[in-house]
Amino acid sequence: MPENPAAEKMQVLQVLDRLRGKLQEKGDTTQNEKLSAFYETLKSPLFNQILTLQQSIKQLKGQLSHIPSDCSANFDFSRKGLLVFTDGSITNGNAHRPCSSITASESLPWTQRSGNEDFTSVIQQMAQGRHIEYIDIERPSTGGLGFSVVALRSQSLGLIDIFVKEVHPGSVADRDQRLKENDQILAINDTPLDQNISHQQAIALLQQATGSLRLVVAREVGHTQSRTSTSSADTTLPETVRWGHTEDVELINDGSGLGFGIVGGKSSGVVVRTIVPGGLADRDGRLQTGDHILKIGSTNVQGMTSEQVAQVLRNCGNSVRMLVARDPVGEIAVTPPTPASLPVALPVVATRTLGSDSSPFETYNVELVKKDGQSLGIRIVGYVGTAHPGEASGIYVKSIIPGSAAYHNGQIQVNDKIVAVDGVNIQGFANQDVVEVLRNAGQVVHLTLVRRKTSLSASPFEQPSSREAVAEPPEVPELTGSLKPETNSRMEAEEIGERLDNLRKDTVQALEKPDVYPEDIPGCPENELKSRWENLLGPDYEVMVATLDTQIADDEELQKYSKLLPIHTLRLGMEVDSFDGHHYISSIAPGGPVDTLNLLQPEDELLEVNGVQLYGKSRREAVSFLKEVPPPFTLVCCRRLFDDEASVDEPRTVEPSLLEAEVDRSVDVSTEDDDGELALWSPEVKTVELVKDCKGLGFSILDYQDPLDPMRSVIVIRSLVADGVAERSGELLPGDRLVSVNEFSLDNATLAEAVEVLKAVPPGVVHLGICKPLVEEEKEEKEEHFIFHSNNNGDNSESPETVHEIHSSLILEAPQGFRDEPYLEELVDEPFLDLGKSLQFQQKDMDSSSEAWEMHEFLSPRLERRGEEREMLVDEEYEIYQDRLRDMEAHPPPPHIREPTSASPRLDLQAGPQWLHADLSGGEILECHDTESMMTAYPQEMQDYSFSTTDMMKETFGLDSRPPMPSSEGNGQHGRFDDLEHLHSLVSHGLDLGMMTPSDLQGPGVLVDLPAVTQRREQEELPLYRLPSARVVTKPSSHVGMVSSRHANAACELPEREEGEGEETPNFSHWGPPRIVEIFREPNVSLGISIVGGQTVIKRLKNGEELKGIFIKQVLEDSPAGKTKALKTGDKILEVSGVDLQNASHAEAVEAIKSAGNPVVFVVQSLSSTPRVIPSVNNKGKTPPQNQDQNTQEKKAKRHGTAPPPMKLPPPYRAPSADTEESEEDSALTDKKIRQRYADLPGELHIIELEKDKNGLGLSLAGNKDRSRMSIFVVGINPDGPAAADGRMRVGDELLEINNQILYGRSHQNASAIIKTAPTRVKLVFIRNEDAVNQMAVAPFPVPSHSPSPVEDLGGTEPVSSEEDSSVDAKPLPERESSKPEDLTQAVDDSMVAEQEKASESPDSAARQMKQPGYSAQVSSSSQEIPSAPAPLCQSTHADVTGSGNFQAPLSVDPAPLSVDPATCPIVPGQEMIIEISKGRSGLGLSIVGGKDTPLDAIVIHEVYEEGAAARDGRLWAGDQILEVNGVDLRSSSHEEAITALRQTPQKVRLVIYRDEAQYRDEENLEVFLVDLQKKTGRGLGLSIVGKRSGSGVFISDIVKGGAADLDGRLIRGDQILSVNGEDVRQASQETVATILKCVQGLVQLEIGRLRAGSWASSRKTSQNSQGDQHSAHSSCRPSFAPVITSLQNLVGTKRSSDPPQKCTEEEPRTVEIIRELSDALGVSIAGGKGSPLGDIPIFIAMIQANGVAARTQKLKVGDRIVSINGQPLDGLSHTDAVNLLKNAFGRIILQVVADTNISAIATQLEMMSAGSQLGSPTADRHPQDPEELLQRTAD
């Protein structure tokens, strides 16, 4: 049996993990099942109990040998397996006394009786000449022995000795009169406490002793007459009260709580009211209900309220020591404790000299007089509590302010310890409490200070081992127990790290044997470590050395927090965050090993573990080391001392950013700004003056979690109200941090508080303290991370009723009309829902302010998860891409942008055109605000151009120094669009109209024309298209803007294109020449155009440019404008009948068009497809600014209607300081530092610089095959790219840094954001290792030279760049894809597939997938927790793609599909069917899931969109498997290859489809399990949900990293939520489930359904389960079944006519017996019957499901005619009657069947035509018109 089962078990689990990882790397999955079973067995609670029980039995053997023969050994085992000793005579609630865990593996050594000479010699040796006394104490039937002990380190070899700390008055020991304080216990029950007995074992011996307790103690000869109590000063009760019994109770909190409740108050005292059964107090057995609590630790709690006592208990840490009393005699009259005002005496530190009364300290009193309201002028820093055993605890003077009272006094020195203020002893006070005491002191302040004498003077920060306390008289040294705490959460009577140094006010008799501290022992390893690090770090840091030996006998200590932390922290009980070589404790698990020390705390830096320095190592190295290092652990940590620093008598005006920056610098002091990684704002506070008017200040705010301190949030400017006070001032920008309003500091203020402060400010001048975002070259690479979002969106911790109240205040002092309607939030953790819903505006709102909410599309994927726990990201039934959802969440709309209430009618997409005509044709449709909204589902051509009405949609949010999409970088890659009418899909998926250029900072106006670029997201990797911007002349502005996208989702309602599908897309690049269009008005008919835009800015670029103008949003076909065929969506209107509109407002444009005569003459510009000259790469960064005079002249000429000339391509984005070159010396130093940083890594380190071209670096990247390791490998190099031209990079190189930003060991999110935001000149640090090829998640492949590929990410990491591949048509994306299992949902629309969550998907990567055989990708990282074996990489050779897009299909080895008319043939379940679908004017309208690289292992239709061609065709259903597409075999293809094949389909699509016989699953084909998540206050569940567009079912679409679901680890994307807290949500809508999840609190139990992995295959023999949803399968389409019925009837008729009537086709009837339970599915489908669509043919078996009970008999066959059921003949029965018979048949079912050859032939051709109408589910609830319902029913 192992000595420490818990530790041994953890080691075995780690070995298993490593073994599994190595097998996975080798691709060996043969042992997965065995290893998984072994792993689960080790982790099971039963196994843990067995281990605990074994340990307890071993302990029992050791304990029984020490129980006196005259005492009975009553013991038991708890439910956890712990050994519990009980005394049969114990009564009155004291029957349970758990045995403390004895960590030594061997049993306690047997020793001889006291008469033995060996025993006597041992005792004499231990006594060292002191007086020895033998004491027998009889344990009473109730209560304890009446004394407490403390463990102190002895002077001999550093051993631990046990001393009597206190003898309680009136106790057994006190009445015996022999046991004295400070006695050293040498033996307990004849067991000497030598080096073989640990202090835990000694404590256990005292606790477990029954009957007589025999003690051998040693006592100093001169101190045998010591006081009996040391606490009389604090515990003396009024003379009117006498207690019958007092007891000292110590409880060691194991993380589950103390287990008792209190009640009472100041007058009556605090009384124990309840004791929780099975809780800690109950198990301890000493505390009883009705006990009065007199003291807690050294704090007298008499006279306190119950709440104050509760607070004292909470502050005690793990060890809680209480003095309780019961059985009062006389009247209880408790008086509150008075402040100690006794003279302050000199504390005496124990020395090795016996009887020494000398003191190294001197004390003195100082009187300070505050003058003219000044402060005292001292800064203090505190060590408070027992968090620093052995350290100099107390309040010290940190610094003295020159010119202050303390400065002029001259007596106070830095490092003086303050022990009293105005006679009030402040020892033990918290730092902030001392500050308050000093502030509240009068004009004259008396301070009592302690200072080391000159000869011994040293900084307390350098020698924190000094232990002082106020003592009286001075010459009496104090007994203080300073120990290195050992981890054992079941020590019940031991004093660990006593609080005597700062809490005790009583006097303690001295030991003549002095205290010895670890720090005082010259050879102590802890002291050496501490000294070494203190010398390295200097006096500003406190160094702590802790030793952990995680020998936890009860393994539940680990279990209770094992799910919260990674494996490497299980043994330590803490998690570590790493930043640039520093490793900080980010969280400590309650009850874990580190927590029990009560020494370390979050933000402490981990310097060294077991002699190995972690400082300077990467996170990967540190984590790897922590996984492997064996216990015991010696941890060296440091803490910056002035974290708690405060200025006395002065407000805390020090900006938190300063302290945070200092914390981040930690140890590394260099010229490099190491703290810049998280420092978002400048520490400099700028004061901005705004004049508040009746409309308010004109900006909105949000709260944002401070990345430097997860426990606090900061207030950030979210957006500016158009033409508001803030915008007009020009000094306030979105992204600025708001730190103060007038004199009120917003530091640590909540969002609601900040709103109230801003609201309460009276009109007039308002002074705002603002911190600007940092803009530095080092930070440019990570600027995209710092897009702000709120950690508390107001709804996390609020009830649903209050959510809208908080959000409605985000816009401050908006005009009254904006606040008329309540802001209704229907989302969970998200402030809005469906962008396609109509908006409700009031006309006055639109005119009075053009403030409008707009979505910020470009949130960094890394930041979306950092510090956030998002519960639901729900966009009603529309599935907006998740990166967009997070954007929406981060930037809630102002309250006046209202979502319609739940009662508002939702306009169906199909009704869009009718609604528009009805709403707009009655008047001038140009009055956009007269309509209820221009946002509902417009006709396709109206949606396509997504510049919204500016009054409604002006984007105002942006960040000053953070490019919205830095990945575009102005590289000039042209977007290709079919038409501007497809721009709607681009807006939905990430628009950016510009990027910053160096010239943007110079000159008042810059002409900018921006290319279309693609944006890709981490995880989702959705192709996101950028809009080619309208050419406008912009005016300078410092605001950042985002493209208006409120229309985005409505614009993307239809997944198909209505016109021009499959056309070659022209390469639009710039505005063409102006042209004149005349439109003749018709009576009572509107012109038929709608416009968008105006004088307000549609788009603000990062450099301050503004895009504005009037654009055509939609042209109605049958209108006068539509008939001209000269205007189209996206055209810019320059002039109307002589009125220049280039700088006109929206209202002016509307009026101009209204007032124009007949005809109306428009001067418009359209985007031109003329090729544009692209500047050379070398000139990109150095494009001179536009001539300012020229720009000014052009700007002046605008009002004369002249069209601007075609724009040139802007230079690539550069950081403002990018032109500043590092000196050679600095560069050399940096390179040297980099080489030192990675010196320990195997391989050859390279540092190179590359210049990106228009296509990026020309690299393809992938992650590590082992998902637990974060790597970024080069898997492909484009021969035409910069990397290939440079020649120094090779395939297999691992990127470590880019532009001084560390990628090594960082998450994919971090790496992606850094890579994407890199400027043009890129400095790369990479390492070359021969073994890298074996670690790469994707096999290396060459990048075709004709493909201008950027840096691309293939293995779950982000793409480095995201420019389009010009060889791929950038088709418009559909708005929706469904998130289904394995986060691989795709929407097949037209010739493209929109991907939601699969990694590595964008036009350029799609092209590469088509061109490169062998390409595969990992499943995104959110699926790491899938319990099944990882999907192997797809190694098959995929279909080659020719330049024209035609595929060479590999030969199929599957059986030949049924060959019938593919245009009309039905899909026969169980057979491969060839079908053809003509797409017409729309796309296919499918979404797919699966692939060989996913657990689904097949390409499966997830949903059929009712607007698409597949739905019109009517044959494809959700759940059908696609085997081939136009000859391309998808049976063994990866997910991306299927996307590629479906994207390239021509007008007529030829598909090979397989419909599983058991496709429409019951839940038996789902793995159903329960998941319990704890929803904490203010936090969400950390998951996103999505509903099917048609049908029911809600699925998990995303797991937020760091959230509750992610930490639990069991949920994955695609899981279906079946119930929430027992409430069935299978049929519930997405909104309903979102509401339920939003409202639940506390423990949330989710019932989850997950498709069994590997249930799909490409043949009927192995395909048994289905991905298809049983409800959505029918609701997703309504097939046109006329051809089906016709073909079936023809088939039946042909068969009948071809068979000779005289020939008997029947065999003898067979009797089949089936036993069916109530929960069983029968598993057969039947067809035929009277009135059947096939005709009146006999009822026969059309399908047998493999998982049904019928199949188990193996006696039924497809085609068998059913003669009778349970004796009832079926002749003449209708199909429905037969179905009902089978439905209701349970128990023993007798079927008589006949093998009819005619029927068999029909059945063979049909091959079980449908599995849709399972009798186990209500068939009537589904579509009875479906052909499957008419032809056959399935009987369960």
Swiss-Prot record:
Record's compositionally biased regions (Acidic residues): 1219-1228
Biased composition (Basic and acidic residues): 1372-1383
Gene3D superfamilies from the UniProt entry: 1.20.1440.360, 2.30.42.10
Principal subcellular localization: other
Membrane-topology descriptor: Peripheral membrane protein
Every PDZ domain range: 134-221, 248-328, 365-453, 555-641, 687-773, 1074-1166, 1245-1328, 1472-1555, 1568-1650, 1709-1795
Tissue expression from the record: Abundantly expressed in germ cells, also expressed in testes and seminiferous tubules, with faint expression in Sertoli cells (at protein level).
GO CC term (a single one): perinuclear region of cytoplasm
Modified residues (Phosphothreonine): T1545
Keyword Cytoplasm attributed: yes
Keywords: Cell junction, Cell membrane, Cytoplasm, Membrane, Phosphoprotein, Repeat, Tight junction
Cell compartment(s), UniProt: Cell junction, Tight junction; Apical cell membrane; Cytoplasm, Perinuclear region
Nucleotide-binding as UniProt keyword: no
Pro residues composition-biased segments: 1203-1214
Residues modified to Phosphoserine: S455, S459, S482, S647, S1217
L27 domain segment(s): 1-65
Pfam families reported in the protein's UniProt record: L27_2, PDZ
Polar residues compositional bias, start-end: 456-466, 1173-1191, 1415-1426, 1434-1448
Function according to Swiss-Prot or TrEMBL: Scaffolding protein that facilitates the localization of proteins to the cell membrane. Required for the correct formation of tight junctions and epithelial apico-basal polarity. Acts (via its L27 domain) as an apical connector and elongation factor for multistranded TJP1/ZO1 condensates that form a tight junction belt, thereby required for the formation of the tight junction-mediated cell barrier. Positively regulates epithelial cell microtubule elongation and cell migration, possibly via facilitating localization of PRKCI/aPKC and PAR3D/PAR3 at the leading edge of migrating cells.
Assembly: Forms a ternary complex with PALS1 and CRB1. Component of a complex whose core is composed of ARHGAP17, AMOT, PALS1, INADL/PATJ and PARD3/PAR3. Forms a heterotrimeric complex composed of MMP5, LIN7B and PATJ; the N-terminal L27 domain of PALS1 interacts with the L27 domain of PATJ and the C-terminal L27 domain of PALS1 interacts with the L27 domain of LIN7B. Component of a complex composed of CRB3, PALS1 and PATJ. As part of the Crumbs complex; interacts with WWP1, the interaction is enhanced by AMOTL2 and facilitates WWP1 localization to the plasma membrane.
Domain note: The L27 domain (also called Maguk recruitment domain) is required for interaction with PALS1 and CRB3, and PALS1 localization to tight junctions. The PDZ domain 6 mediates interaction with the C-terminus of TJP3 and is crucial for localization to the tight junctions. The PDZ domain 8 interacts with CLDN1 but is not required for proper localization.
Protein name as catalogued: InaD-like protein
Organism whose genome encodes this protein: Rattus norvegicus (Rat)
